[in-house]
Amino acid sequence: MTETEIFTSLNNTLMATGLFAITWAFLVWVAGRAVTIAVENNAGIITKIVTTIFGLSALWQFNFAFAYVPWSFATAAHSLAVLKSSGTDLTLNGESFLNAFPGEVSASAAPVFTIIPNDPFYTLFILSALYLVVGRLWIGNK
């Protein structure tokens, strides 16, 4: 794979991930609206359970879509490191990408996909969205 193909693949992955993220962000918003309506109308247990399942599913998929972003960057950095280790000279952009990449980039070990965010602010975002979608429904507005 050439450097151009690596960056093209990264950009295509980020565009597709963005489309999925927009879709799931909208569904998380729908879940939040459903929770607001359920709380305002003092909904029954069946409505609360269905709303909780929908909200958790939307939030899970939203988190899953955003887990691809750091993994995509790590995969591109790994591919560039493999390309560099094979003796191919990288452009200044490729070298800059590798040098600016946070963490260790290895040509021998591929990045591992994980849905657990390593950014504390993103973790706080997911936890606050979890409260807004599920916590308000079961705990209330106390």
What are these model-derived regions, one by one?
Residues 1-33:
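Cytosolic-side membrane-entry/anchor segment at the start of a transmembrane helix
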Residues 18-25, 53, 57-60, 124-129:
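Residue-level signal for the membrane-embedded core of alpha-helical transmembrane segments
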Residues 38-59:
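Interfacial segments of alpha-helical transmembrane regions
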Residues 69-101:
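Juxtamembrane non-transmembrane "cap" segments at the membrane-aqueous interface
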Residues 26-36, 111-142:
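Transmembrane alpha-helical segments in integral membrane proteins
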